[in-house]
Amino acid sequence: MATSRRRPRSRQPELFARSKRPVIVIEENHRLVQMTDEIDWTELLELVEEIRRSKVTSAAGRPPHLRALTGALVFRATRRMPYRVTEDQIRHYAPARYLCGLTESEWTPDANTIQDFEQQLGEDGIRRLNEYVVKWAVEEKLADPKLMVADTTAQEAAIPHPNEMGLMATFVSAVVAASKRVGPALKGFLAKAGGLFVAAKRKVREYRLFAKDKSKAAKDRMTAQMATVVESVQKQLAQALRHAGAVKDRLKRHRKIAWTKIQRVHQTMAKLLPQIRYWLKTGYVAANKIISLHVPELYSIVRGKVGKTVEFGLSWGIRRLRGGFLLATLAKNKNDVHDSKFAVRAVKDHVTLFGKPPKAYAYDRGGWSRENVEQLKKLGVRDVGLAPQGKADWAVQGKVKEKLIAERALVEGGIGTIKAGKYGFNKPAAKSVDTMAMCGQRAVLGFNLNKMVRGLAERKEMVLVG
């Protein structure tokens, strides 16, 4: 039987094949072109190399393409995109190749290389790059460190809303999936605990389908029954991990990763189960409640907002200089950047970075106390604009007070901008706290770089495109 020939898509094909090596002119006023031309790459690459040397234990191997990788980091910072999209953009988007210094080369960094480079820099490394950009803005008179305002915010994690039944269902699913990937080492555990997995699946389905119409007591009873099943799984899993301990050293690649994951989930659930039992018994949430099985370092942050009283993720302190440039400080724990503490710490960090305190400083009423006002004055702040609580008086009056109130309101706009989808501060595609923190600093870096290039373009009376 003769095969039919496929009809060509074009009724009138080209006489000569079109070239796949186009020659185009990149506009001088393109945002990425101006950014590339204005950045002092010598200084920036020296800083990147210094950060890299502090983290690399051996200099063996081929040297990295720091110029291209730093350009890729800047490109990703100014507009949120996945790593593979970044690779594709750098390969085919002329302004991005110009930013990475690759217009005379056919080489392109792949997605894995870009990701490894960012993870090597880490949150602290990208924070230092951001401080470099802010100091550059101060030199260009686009930012004024003499006036600073500060606030705290929450970086929400990309996790489902935590509840006890959901966390236990996640545990069972993770244990089953990881045990299958481990292979023969946990084959006996899967066979022995098969009935428990079926029971857990049935209870989760019943809860999700029918608990909506039941009373709180009935819901708690269903949760307690599920907790009993999970406890049995935990006991059998602990025995299986002990018996298979000698085998773990022979595991390779994906099986080794699955073994590590199942151990981590097992340890997390050992802490979570008592918290669930405490909640069922008392009706109160336990201190340091685990809200994510896969990222147990996350915590709840009470915000008191309308429609969103609690957020789940990480706490950050944000400082804003006059001119709009931002500096971000990651909390080491849940209470590290509480308003009452960060109101003073922000000025201390400012002194560390610039060598002297701001002349004027503003913070909302969450940071007010007479002790904080006195401490800020001792640090050298002339105009202390902490919004007072109750009937207490302001430490400043008149136009100074009005100016500080106006500047204080602007920090909310900056925080809202970095949380927009363009920069990706909120709910980043991250599976660890370290990656979340890195994404947060990268969002602030992109915000400052875009602000920087717009300010420099305005001086030239140039309208940016791209």
Mark where each language-model region is.
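Basic, short loop/linker segments at the boundary and entry of helix-turn-helix/winged-helix-like folds
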Residues: 25-74, 78, 394
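Charged, often Cys/His-bearing segments associated with DNA-binding zinc-finger transcription factors
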Residues: 1-44, 49-50, 454-466
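A short structural micro-motif
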Residues: 54, 93-96, 136-139
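Catalytic micro-motifs at enzyme active sites that drive phosphoryl/nucleotidyl and oxygen chemistry
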Residues: 60-61, 99-105, 136-137
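Short, positively charged loop/turn segments that connect secondary-structure elements
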Residues: 93-113
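Anion-binding and metal-coordination hotspots
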Residues: 82-85, 90, 106-107, 114-466
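Amphipathic alpha-helical interaction surfaces
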Residues: 75-78, 92-96, 320
